[in-house]
Curated annotation (Swiss-Prot):
Main location: cytoplasm
Cofactor requirements of the protein: FAD
SMART domains, A to Z: GIDA_assoc_3 (SM01228)
Gene: mnmG
Species this chain originates from: Ehrlichia ruminantium (strain Gardel)
Compartment(s) where it occurs, according to its Swiss-Prot or TrEMBL record: Cytoplasm
Binding site for NAD(+): 273-287
Gene3D superfamilies: FAD/NAD(P)-binding domain, GidA associated domain, C-terminal subdomain, tRNA uridine 5-carboxymethylaminomethyl modification enzyme MnmG/GidA
Protein's recorded name: tRNA uridine 5-carboxymethylaminomethyl modification enzyme MnmG
């Protein structure tokens, strides 16, 4: 008889983080996957990070997750998006060698302490009914093997009753040539989970040798490339270029003439696709006034002959794809290695989940990744690590849930959006979703999260020591700058003019001036040069934003006060005077854990919040009396 503390189904980006997190905390963990060889597979684009997404990768890394370290072993073109804007919206991104990424993730997972990997297909799970809610008991594989578990995490990606479409052709699959999961979908439906249908897509893969790069715009990465992980010193792989081309009026004519053949325009038109990553057919239809759309030609590896054309996701028939591609500059003689396609799949309404990502209907069942209605490797990884941590912590009956709030992390923003608002289309993170993005930056994820993770045993002692060393260096340099007084006359010697009022200003305060940076100050304060470049950058960013932090702190304190005003899980909203039936039903279904969470539910009015607060205070005082 096989028994585990935590079982994770799915070996994608979410499943790997969930399994590793649970094992790291000490849970006896089993990861079940259709194929060990596809653990860590990059199903779509060969890249990690981006705007907001790159910050999530840093947050996962700050909690000792895998993604940051793995991409640092596979990065072949690294850049910081939005570098011309403020640090709050910088987006670290790395092009990956697809094979190196997969191998590095597999090496991590297959050698992880407390973690076992099983190659099997799970068709069902069972529960016990000896408590107020059904409780996870076991999983059953396709060959009828029963594996007992206390906690189960579903990270099924696009495999939950997945179907692939290429033109009028369709076949059950969660990924090209990989079977979908049908049994689990039926099991979830039997427990009355609210299931929906979403779709996503991928472009055709191209033969590098059939592309003429000579007339295309070369896109080199940063020099030197920046690592994702706070534990990585540098990127050691050779860096190669991507190339930029674009569609044109001829391309669009081919697409328009064949729109009726594309699955996304025909069979799947009622199923929502990612709004911010539309297919080329949808781009042409929605933006008919545009004569071109960018296409980024991204290499899939250092030794790969395959090019990923980012920007032309399609579900058209193969012959239409070929005709369309040959109208694009550089692709006149292109050969398709693998067809683009669209995939539709089941997802759970994320409002069926708590902030821990445990389901409300089955105790001990957690969901993470695309099954919750999100899109993207990074969003999946962020959910996976939270589900894994909470599943492991909940093995102790007296555990405190690990919940990241909206002012803690982008992961907290994402999960709160999902479980509070739900989603009707694939959810993607943006910096605009975060109210406190001045604090939620890519440079300080470790300062925000690593100590929190260490307190619950999710972070290693080595990483904790690394954090403390960084904090010491940042504090030392900050103090030096605050104690160093600089006159306007000293700055004028270096070509910087500020008010000649003779007033003494600290070097730290001067950094809030957009015309002053660490490079200038280092010519006056020689001690700056004694510190690592990362420390210098960290202190400079903190100083630049310092005046804004003071203003934002009041908002954060108000937010925290509402988040700390807890609503009992067993509260009967029907007993609260003044709530409409509609609001009562919404609150009873959602079961918000706090006043802040209740306030963010659409349709819950300020008056309703006042009534809830009055009810909570009355009953609190009644208990005291």
């Amino acid at each position: 008889m096989k028994k585990y503390d935590v079982v994770v189904i799915g070996g994608g980006h979410s499943g790997c983080e969930a399994a590793a997190a649970a094992a790291r905390i000490g849970a006896k963990t089993l990861l079940i996957t259709h194929s060990i060889s596809t653990i860590g597979e990059m199903s779509c684009n060969p890249a990690i990070g981006g705007i907001a997404k790159g910050i999530v990768v840093r947050e996962v890394d700050a909690l000792d997750g895998l993604m940051g370290k793995v991409i640092d072993n596979a990065s072949i073109n690294s850049t910081i998006l939005n570098r011309s804007k403020g640090p709050a919206v910088w987006g670290p991104r790395a092009q990956a060698d697809r094979d190196l990424y997969r191998h590095a993730m597999q090496n991590s997972i297959l050698n992880y302490p407390n973690l076992t990997v099983l190659e099997a297909s799970v068709e069902n799970f069972t529960t016990t009914d000896n408590q107020e809610l059904p409780t996870i008991n076991s999983v059953i594989t396709a060959d009828q093997e029963v594996i007992y578990t206390k906690k189960l995490i579903l990270t099924t990606g696009t495999f939950l009753q997945g179907t692939i479409h290429i033109g009028s052709y369709n076949t059950p699959a969660g990924r090209f040539n990989e079977q979908s999961s049908v049994g689990l979908a039926k099991t979830l439906a039997s427990y009355n989970f609210k299931l929906g249908r979403l779709r996503t897509g991928t472009p055709p893969r191209l033969d590098r040798n059939s592309i003429n790069f000579s007339g295309l715009q070369e896109q080199k990465g940063d020099t030197p490339p920046s690592p994702f992980s706070y534990m990585s010193e540098s990127i050691n792989l050779p860096q190669i270029s991507c190339y930029l081309t674009a569609t044109n009026t001829k391309t669009h004519e081919v697409i328009k003439n064949n729109l009726h053949k594309a699955a996304a325009s025909n069979l799947l038109k009622e199923i929502k696709a990612p709004r911010y990553c539309p297919s080329i057919e949808e781009k042409v239809r929605r933006f008919s006034e545009r004569n071109s759309h960018q296409v980024f030609l991204e290499p899939e590896g250092l030794n790969s002959e395959i090019i990923y054309p980012n920007g032309i996701t399609t579900s058209s028939p193969l012959d239409v794809q070929q005709t369309m591609l040959k109208t694009i500059l550089g692709l006149e003689n292109v050969k398709i290695v693998r067809s683009g396609y669209s995939v539709e799949y089941n997802f759970i309404d994320p409002r069926e989940l708590y902030h821990t990502l445990e389901t409300k209907k089955i105790r001990g069942l957690y969901c993470a990744g695309q099954i919750n209605g999100t899109t993207g490797y990074e969003e999946a990884a962020g959910q996976g690590i939270i589900a894994g941590i909470n599943a492991a912590l909940s093995l102790n009956s007296n555990y405190e849930p690990f919940i990241l709030k909206r002012n803690d992390a982008y992961i907290g923003v994402m999960i709160d959006d999902l479980v509070t608002l739900g989603t009707s289309e694939p959810y993607r993170l943006f910096t605009s979703r975060a109210e406190y993005r001045l604090r939620l930056r890519s440079d300080n994820a470790d300062l925000r999260l690593t100590e929190l993770g260490y307190k619950i045993s999710a972070v290693s002692y080595q990483r904790y020591l690394t954090l403390n060393r960084k904090k010491e260096e940042v504090t030392k340099l900050t103090n030096i700058l605050k104690e160093t007084v600089i006159l306007p006359s000293q700055l004028s010697q270096h070509g910087v003019c500020i008010s000649q009022d003779g007033r003494k200003r600290s070097a730290f305060d001067l950094l809030s001036n957009p015309n002053i940076n660490m490079n200038i100050l280092s010519k006056i304060c020689n001690q700056i040069k004694n510190y690592h470049a990362n420390t210098i950058q960290q202190v400079e960013i903190e100083a630049k934003y310092a005046p804004y932090f003071i203003k934002q702190e009041l908002d954060i304190q108000s937010f925290i006060a509402e988040e700390n005003t807890h609503i009992p899980h067993d509260i009967e909203f029907s007993q609260i005077h003044g709530l409409s039936t509609e609001i009562q039903e919404k609150l009873q279904y959602m079961k918000p854990p706090s006043i802040g969470s209740a306030r963010r539910i659409p349709g819950v009015t300020p008056a309703a919040i006042t009534n809830i607060l009055f009810y909570l205070r009355y009953h609190k005082n009644k208990k005291i009396l």
